[in-house]
Amino acid sequence: MADATHLFDRGVAAVAIAALVVAAHASASDKVDGVRAAIKQGTLYVKGGDGGQQVALRLKVGDTSVIQVDAGDNGSADFSFARGAVHAIKVKMGDGNDSARIDDSNGAFTGDSSSRPTTIAGGGGNDSLQGGQTQVAAQNETFRGGDGNDLVDGGKGNDTAYLGGGNDTFRWDNGEGSDVIEGQDGTDTMLFNGAAVAENVTMSANGGRLTFFRTQGNVTMDTDGVEIVDDNALGGADSVTVNDLTGTDVTQTNIDLASALGGSAADGAVDNVVVNGTNGDDNIDITGNGSGADVTGLATAVSVKRADPTDILPVNTLAGTDHVATSGVAGEIQVLVDGVLV
């Protein structure tokens, strides 16, 4: 029995030594490029300083039992921790224009089956915060932008973002999950990049919140405090409906029908952008903008750009005594007012 006990003790010691070796790149008290990292009560804390820092977290190549922290985001590990010892991750950057991202190129490790909640926070400055981008596994992260004009890219999974002060942007790309966006202060934008296939998108008011729903993928974006919605529909015969958004914070919706992101050419497919008015008395102006039309006079202005002349813009006034004026739309887009071509 003595021998058995002795062997067990040696095994425990070996595990402890291995854990120490894993964390050997830099001690918890060390600062690398202004960044500290340490585990406390099961939470991996990564903290930036007041300068502009870049941080990436990833799994070790060839050994997914190790989480690495890359201060400088230059591809080298400055801190390493046993994955099994990490039950939550909190990244907090300081002042300055910082970048913090989850690099899941070696595997997913945030919001996975181990329930490892992850929060990525900026500070003052114009920060870039990015969740896992490549893995199919759900990676549900929470983002806190702080002050400054921040860019948050949630990536895969169902994410929650608190954008904070400043004029911030939340980015969504095809294949990602359903996200919750709290715009908070400033003029904030949701940038939604679709796919080069036929898509059906509907924007509706849910009390004071915007519900942005895409049928393909069953994607729901739930937003509050977001003033601008940029929808890049891309290729395919798309259908986008903008309902009455009275009560929400959305004042501008931009529908880009170009065939490619940043492109200037229309996609050649017949797209439909439907704008629904209110049951009150509406005064609506529909004006050509050189590549489509702008619809103003409702709670939310709608701008359709890079349209084909065969694309269709139905404007439905609904109930009430309404007035609609059109100008400069000939050859830009097919405008229908209450079903009548104008």
PLM regions with names:
Residues 3-13:
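Bacterial N-terminal signal peptides that target proteins for export
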Residues 1-2, 28:
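Initiator methionine at the very start of the polypeptide chain
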Residues 14-21:
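Bacterial N-terminal signal peptides
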